[in-house]
């Protein structure tokens, strides 16, 4: 089947254009690799400063090419900063300003390349109109779960132009929202969601960017499946009156290379499935109080743990740890606890037989990695779509547990950490722990089913081929 697809779709040409954040670039790369295996020609747009890293992530294929983009000068944007990884959240907003100034450059490239489709991201609200004028179809590729789009950015959220919702409005789902486990959100979560309606540097709000993109595109592509999010997918389809193509949740390839020896040696000391691995992504910095309560909560489980903490650039990590961690903590846990700052081989660690639990920020890719590696998922979401990921996984999928937090400000204590971990690691013979562990195994089996994965990509290629009216003869 795949060989037939390869032969028949040689002519299909797709431009992929993610926002300049690796949390967005990575899903675009994963999809590019899948499409190239079906013989689809891919031109990958990214800032020149990101090109070498993107190249290392893309599979080598004669039909895949990187197109480096030149970022214009923007007051306040440091020279050479071409992804959110090098910027604070406030300065990262300037990347959207830069992107908006790149429209002439993008139009020239698209006029020259003449692809059948552009797969674009949330920030390029102007792209559908531009591409349409050039006779090019556009697909809005949503890298967040469908629940996030359904709850936050559907037209039903703003029923009158520019009359944005209040804090109380954001606690409730929008009009017509399907009946699911998500019936409300907490005050601190709703407050975080209000970011969607803020304007930065006199630019469009995130909500308005997403609306323009979704309303203007030819079709919507979602990194999800009906088994996980059926009601939300139907709601999004009805709200925008557009076809929604699905590619299923993207399961990462098994890690290449061996786990660093010092970590492998340490993990090998413990019984299978007993170690807690804990990390919150590269762009999350916990407060001193959060570090303290998290560390004490992990200690109180009595289980071995590997805690990865991130700190802003140019700070003294040792000094930060000494200030944030309780006095005597490192000495107390030296035999069964590791506190590390910096990059680690996360996939390799989750795949290690000793690791049985992942305490995380509920980034959906991280959750998928945990589920397929037989790790129980304990979630402490930090912002935005992570909050809704956690509700999907703990509520609709019943495949993880969310750490309890105070409604007003999101405070959590060591007891909340301990209680959540023990549900899935200690009290495993009674619900909810028993049910969650059973569901983890079911979702693992589903996610690793290669026939299902291939079917989604094959269907997408067929749909795009039909839309583009590419000759398959």
From Swiss-Prot:
The keyword Glycosyltransferase applies. GO terms for molecular function: anthocyanidin 3-glucoside rhamnosyltransferase activity; UDP-glucosyltransferase activity. GO terms for biological process: anthocyanin-containing compound biosynthetic process. InterPro entries: UDP-glycosyltransf_plant, UDP_glucos_trans, UDP_glycos_trans_CS. Keywords: Glycosyltransferase, Transferase. Expressed in petals, styles and anthers. Its EC number is 2.4.1.-. Pathway: Pigment biosynthesis; anthocyanin biosynthesis. Belongs to the UDP-glycosyltransferase family. Controls the rhamnosylation of reddish anthocyanidin-3-O-glucosides, which is the first step in a series of modifications that finally yield magenta or blue/purple coloured anthocyanins. Controls the conversion of anthocyanidin-3-O-glucosides to anthocyanidin-3-O-rutinosides. This is Anthocyanidin-3-O-glucoside rhamnosyltransferase. It comes from Petunia hybrida (Petunia). The gene is RT.
């Amino acid at each position: 089947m795949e060989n037939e697809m390869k032969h028949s779709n040689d002519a299909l040409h797709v431009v992929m254009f993610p926002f300049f954040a690796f949390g967005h670039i990575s899903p675009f790369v994963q999809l590019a690799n899948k499409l190239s295996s079906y013989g689809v020609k891919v031109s990958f747009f990214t800032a020149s400063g990101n090109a070498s890293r993107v190249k290392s992530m893309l599979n080598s294929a004669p039909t895949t090419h990187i197109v480096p983009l030149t970022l214009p000068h923007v007051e306040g944007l440091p020279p050479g900063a071409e992804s959110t990884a090098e910027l604070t959240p406030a300065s990262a907003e300037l990347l959207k300003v830069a992107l908006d100034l790149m429209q002439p450059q993008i139009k020239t490239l698209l006029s020259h390349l003449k692809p059948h489709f552009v797969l674009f991201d949330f920030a390029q609200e102007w792209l559908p109109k531009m591409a349409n004028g050039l006779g090019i179809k556009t697909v809005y590729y949503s890298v967040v779960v469908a629940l996030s789009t359904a709850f936050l950015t559907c037209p039903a959220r703003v029923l009158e132009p520019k009359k944005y919702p209040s804090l109380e409005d954001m606690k409730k789902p929008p009009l017509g929202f399907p009946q699911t486990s998500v019936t409300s959100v907490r005050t601190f979560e709703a407050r975080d969601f209000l970011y969607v309606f803020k304007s930065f540097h006199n630019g469009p709000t995130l909500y308005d960017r997403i609306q323009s993109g979704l309303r203007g595109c030819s079709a919507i592509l979602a990194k999800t499946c009906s088994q996980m999010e059926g009601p939300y997918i139907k709601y999004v389809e009805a709200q925008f009156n557009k076809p929604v193509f699905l590619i299923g949740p993207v399961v990462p390839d098994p890690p290449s290379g061996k786990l660093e020896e010092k970590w492998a040696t340490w993990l090998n000391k413990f019984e299978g499935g007993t170690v807690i691995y804990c990390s919150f992504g590269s762009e999350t910095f916990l407060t001193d109080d959060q570090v303290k309560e998290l560390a004490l909560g992990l200690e109180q489980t009595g289980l071995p743990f590997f805690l990865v903490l991130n700190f802003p650039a140019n700070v003294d990590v040792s000094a930060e740890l000494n200030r944030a961690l309780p006095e005597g903590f490192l000495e107390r846990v030296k035999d069964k606890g590791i506190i590390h700052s910096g990059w680690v081989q996360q996939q390799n660690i989750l795949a290690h037989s000793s690791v049985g639990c992942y305490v995380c920020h509920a980034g959906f890719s991280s959750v998928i990695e945990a589920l397929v590696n037989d790790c129980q998922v304990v979630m402490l979401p930090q912002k935005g779509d992570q909050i809704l990921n956690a509700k999907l996984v703990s509520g609709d999928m019943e495949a993880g547990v969310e750490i309890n937090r105070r409604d007003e400000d999101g405070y959590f204590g060591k007891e909340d950490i301990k209680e959540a971990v023990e549900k899935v690691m200690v009290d495993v013979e009674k619900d909810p722990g028993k049910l969650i562990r059973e569901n983890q195994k079911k979702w693992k089996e589903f996610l690793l089913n290669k026939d299902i994965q291939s079917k989604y990509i094959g269907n997408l290629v067929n749909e795009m081929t039909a839309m583009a009216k590419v000759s398959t003869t």
